[in-house]
Design a protein with these regions (language model features):
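Secretory targeting and sorting signals
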Residues: 1-32
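Active-site beta->alpha N-cap acidic-glycine motif
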Residues: 37-123, 127, 133-134
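His/Asp/Glu-enriched short active-site or ligand-binding loop at hydrolase and phosphoryl-transfer sites
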Residues: 144, 152, 157-193, 228-235
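Short histidine/acidic/glycine/proline-rich micro-motifs that form metal-
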Residues: 90-93, 117-119, 152, 174-177, ...
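C-terminal domain-boundary segment and adjacent tail
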Residues: 40, 44-51, 80, 93-94, ...
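Charged helix-capping and loop-helix junction motifs
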Residues: 127-132, 183-187, 213-217
Length: 235
């Protein structure tokens, strides 16, 4: 009797066990996956902060044109897309007129630096005027700006220039590149003294200007990195 009852209960117990097993959740398949980092979108990229505007500065070159160095300086200016004022000597223009034309063609300005670089303060009014006119005869027109050689001027010279309808332009930063102190010395002197509105004096003629060429190639990107814009004076 007991054996018969056990045989009847066994299928029922097995069915109940199977139902209980199916009712237990499968944690391996239903647990949430661990969080993953969201994809980076364009709007989440790190923004590059622009350099703050520090001012406008101006490049000027004296004593050219030079057959050797002026074209090399022009190449550096074109490389960076900047322009300068070249205060030229009339006698040099007569030797290398095509170089002066190239400077103007590529957007640079020419200023009057006299015929052959005398100290104008030692000359009479007549000879000051002669020096300026002789340079302009070689150039073919009257530029708007005059730079007296050595920066030597006084009220008399300034009046002569103004009466001609021209502006006297000196400089505010002089790295003394003409003395060939070393490429990095030229660069560092400019960077130390430069301010908003600075007129930087460099030379493309009058001697070996290889250091000036090399310094210019280093100087322009460093001025920009400090927030300076390189402008062009109206000459």
């Amino acid at each position: 009797m007991n054996t018969k009852r056990l045989r009847l209960l066994t299928p029922l117990l097995l069915a109940l066990a199977l139902i209980a097993a199916l009712a237990v959740p499968n944690t391996a398949s239903t647990s949430p996956a661990p969080p993953t980092a969201p994809a980076v979108t364009d709007s989440q990229t790190v923004a590059v902060v622009p350099v703050a505007y520090a001012g406008t500065v101006y490049l000027t070159f004296d004593d050219g044109p030079s057959y050797t160095y002026t074209p090399r300086i022009l190449a550096v200016l074109r490389k960076y897309g900047v322009h300068a004022v070249f205060f030229e000597l009339g006698q040099n223009i007569t030797w290398y007129p095509s170089i002066t034309r190239s400077l103007r063609y590529y957007g640079n300005k020419i200023g009057n630096h006299t015929w052959n670089h005398p100290d104008l303060t030692t000359l009479s009014n007549y000879w000051v005027t002669w020096q300026l006119n002789k340079m302009e005869s070689a150039l073919g027109y009257r530029p708007r700006c005059v730079r007296p050689p050595y920066g030597a001027t006084n009220s008399r010279i300034a009046t002569i220039i103004a009466n001609r309808g021209q502006r006297q332009i000196l400089w505010t930063v002089d790295p003394r590149d003409w003395s060939r102190p070393g490429t990095w010395t030229i660069v560092n002197r400019v960077l130390y003294y430069v301010r908003d509105g600075s007129r930087i004096l460099l030379h493309d003629g009058g001697g070996d200007r290889s250091q000036t060429v090399a310094a210019l190639d280093l100087l322009i990107p460093r001025l920009r990195a400090r927030g300076f814009v390189i402008g062009l004076m109206a000459c």
